[in-house]
Amino acid sequence: MVPFLHKKHLSSAQIILAGFAAVILLGAWLLMLPISSRSGTWTPFLDTLFTSTSAVCVTGLVLYDTATHWTLFGQIVILTLIQIGGMGVITVAASIAMLSGRKITLSQRSTMQDAISAPQVGGIVRFTGFILKGILLVELTGAALLSIVFIRDYGFPRGLWMGIFHSVSAFCNAGFDLLGEKVPFSSLTAYVTNPIVNLTIGHLIILGGLGFLTWEDVCRNKWHFQKYRMQSKVILVSTALLITIPALYFFFFEFNDLPFAVRAWGSWFQSVTPRTAGFNTLDYADMSEVGQFITSALMVIGGAPGSTAGGMKNTTFAVLIACAVAVFQKRKDGHYFGRRLSTDTVKDAVAIFLLYMATFLLGGMIISRVENLPLITCFFESASAVGTVGLTLGITTSLGTVSKIVLITEMFFGRVGGLTLIFATIPAAKNLLSRLPEEKIAVG
């Protein structure tokens, strides 16, 4: 594969961490070069580090408008970083090794398993091939559909490039766009009622956020829902609910002064995009604080494990809900679809939830204190970073050095995963053969 995968003294978590960090630093250096900016000058390192982190961590928060600041070379660098970040650094490395005919060792297969949240090492190479074919098919289909609109509006070959760029950006849940030539940082607001743009980008976001294991499950079992793994069922149902319920709220309680068609399309899209994509067709600054809070919650929850999406993952949220229901019903275990949740799964979910909440809250408070901005605005920005979403209420470009570093840290944390970061930096405790005595404490 790549050299760092041969370091046997590194754990899988450390390899994943090092891989993402290496790609981010390389991307930052390339974006610094005068050839990357339209002005032909060097771009400050902290700004390119921010942009590279945002691209690799498929976030979409930007300090410069992508269409007007970066040259074609810079845009290609950003798109490459997005594709690597969306697929995962280890998956890309494995794909290169497979295509070059190199043999993948057992330890490398184990790292690949951890990187894509696969249930077992067996069949991991075949599964990686399935991922590559699926990504190619989905992104090419998305590019073809979007090019119909963009070639009409921007001509050829500019429209074709925009179709490719936005297809990859949407599928990888990145949120970078090239539509700022007329109005900088406008995202997809010019296409709020365009059915091709809304449906194509919306479904690319959803497909990317479902996870590759879910793809494989659906392809293998077709429409026989009862045959799916419990994880796939939970992901599909929670995804549907986390899109439908917010969409209904947005339609009936937000954007009430807009025409029906704009409100209908906008409500649906604004409930899809917080699943870590970062595109918007309506301005989130026009939402009430309740709407912004709901969006922040959706951003922190994110998409599915083993997907192009970030966040703490909808399965984590679903496990916490199941455990709460079990407590209310005085049952010993949480369960879904006739299957009991394991104790280890519950412990992992609680740890992940606490990690993400602590990072999200601390980041928002630091930005609010340093920038002297309203807390809800800073929490929105923090949720966007830790959930690797890219939505903003318009403060990103005006942030100072400390706030940029906070967001860079949150984006990196949100993409590699809280537990991966912990496992990579903190040595594991020794497993004792004996267990300590148990004693109950009162809670609640």
Regions found by a protein language model. Give the residues of each.
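Membrane-proximal intracellular helices of multi-pass ion channels
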Residues: M1-G444
